[in-house]
Amino acid sequence: MDMEDRDAAIANALEALHMNQTALRAGLEEVSTWIRQRGSVNVHDNVMATLEALDLQASSIASAIERLRS
């Protein structure tokens, strides 16, 4: 496997992980909103703060994919 193929394989794997992370984030946000609507604002706030970390990592993953594919 040459360097270009290796980079493409890594980019593909990262993209799949990124898509899974995005889907998990969306699901967690939905559940968190449901929890907030039932009175647990604290839990919702904690989940949303944690999801911000996922957002930061999502940016890094997207940048890495872009670099590998350029």
Q: Could you describe each region identified by the protein language model?
A:
Residues E4-D7, A11-R36, H44, M48-L51, ...:
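Long amphipathic alpha-helical coiled-coil
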